[in-house]
Swiss-Prot record:
Entry's cofactor comment: Divalent metal ions. Both Ca(2+) and Mn(2+) ions are more effective activators than zinc, cobalt, copper and magnesium ions at low concentrations.
Superkingdom of origin organism: Bacteria
Name this polypeptide is given: NAD kinase 1
InterPro entries reported for this sequence: ATP-NAD_kinase_N, ATP-NAD_kinase_PpnK-typ_C, NAD/diacylglycerol_kinase_sf, NADK
Alphabetized NCBIfam families for the sequence: PRK04885.1
Positions with a binding annotation for NAD(+): 45-46, 122-123, 148, 158, 161-166
Role summary: Involved in the regulation of the intracellular balance of NAD and NADP, and is a key enzyme in the biosynthesis of NADP. Catalyzes specifically the phosphorylation on 2'-hydroxyl of the adenosine moiety of NAD to yield NADP. It can use ATP and other nucleoside triphosphates (GTP, UTP) as well as inorganic polyphosphate (poly(P)) as a source of phosphorus.
pH-activity dependence text: Optimum pH is 9.
Protein species of origin: Bacillus subtilis (strain 168)
Lineage: Bacteria, Bacillati, Bacillota, Bacilli, Bacillales
Catalysed conversion reaction: NAD(+) + ATP = ADP + NADP(+) + H(+)
Regulation: Allosterically inhibited by NADP and activated by quinolinic acid. Strongly inhibited by HgCl(2).
Length: 266
């Protein structure tokens, strides 16, 4: 089996990366950073996001597994003292994969109707470069509202525990193929009105965001911050691709949520 290891870059993570590589090579596995079948992410959720984007062009051929070396990583199943157990599992145990939905973001520009396509594992946020964001929000081709406020966040089910949660959005189980639209500090008064609640859009619905005046946007795709100029529209929907995580032992989604936000309790 071909593998690659991605590290956060700190001393602890780099040391673990070297150990994991050495152990797996001892089991006659092949280190291949271009076309790995499994990618071990050592660090936190940011490290896994980096690995996801690096291999986003081969998601149907690559599975991910996380080892967290700092605070609890939401995407990580393993801790540093378990790496020998993890290596044995990778080398000796047939694993199954779980698939999570992704967010597709298509930015269309006025010039020649040019398009750029992105995939997000967690979320996409859209903000104006200066002042409030003013944009029409269309759902499934129909005008839903004109938004005025700080910005908009569109998240995946697995990303619903990240920025979306801080905005008051719901936590969605990743077995549900949907995206969530949450508002950032919307302006609501007698003149301007928005729905004021997060919206859950199924896989056959898309969300189109069209600027009313400002055409330069700051768009984030997970950990990436991008400046887009002369934007005509931004379309978001559930992607056809899915991310695959290698599972060597049960770790239910709601258990992850409990451990991350509530703790184990007494």
């Amino acid at each position: 089996m071909k593998f690659a290891v991605s590290s956060k870059g700190d001393q602890v993570s780099d040391t673990l990366k070297s150990k994991i590589q050495a152990y797996l090579l001892d089991f006659d596995m092949e280190l291949d950073e271009n076309e790995p079948e499994i990618v071990i992410s050592v660090g936190g959720d940011g490290t896994l996001l980096y690995a996801f984007h690096r291999y986003s062009d081969r998601l149907d051929k690559t599975a991910f597994v996380g080892v967290h070396t700092g605070h609890l990583g939401f995407y990580a199943d393993w801790v540093p003292h378990e790496i020998e157990k993890l290596v044995l599992a990778i080398a000796k145990t047939p694993y199954h994969t779980v698939e999570y939905p992704l967010l597709e973001v298509i930015v269309t520009y006025h010039e020649n109707e040019r398009e750029e396509r992105y995939l997000a594992l967690n979320e996409c946020t859209i903000k104006s470069i200066e002042g409030s964001l003013v944009a029409d929000v269309e759902i499934k081709g129909q005008l839903f509202e004109t938004f005025r406020g700080d910005g908009l966040c569109l998240s995946t089910p697995s990303g619903s525990t990240a920025y979306n949660k801080a905005l008051g959005g719901a936590i969605i189980h990743p077995s549900i193929r949907a995206i969530q639209l949450a508002e950032m500090a919307s302006i609501n008064n007698r003149v301007f009105r928005t729905v004021g609640s997060p919206l859950l859009l199924p896989s056959h619905h898309d969300c189109m965001i069209k600027p009313r005046n400002e055409v330069d946007f700051q768009v984030t795709i997970d950990h990436l911050t991008l400046l887009h100029k002369d934007v005509k529209s931004i379309r978001c929907q559930v992607a056809s691709e899915k991310v695959r995580f290698a599972r060597f032992r049960p770790f239910p989604f709601w258990k992850r949520v409990q451990d991350s936000f509530i703790g184990k309790g007494e």
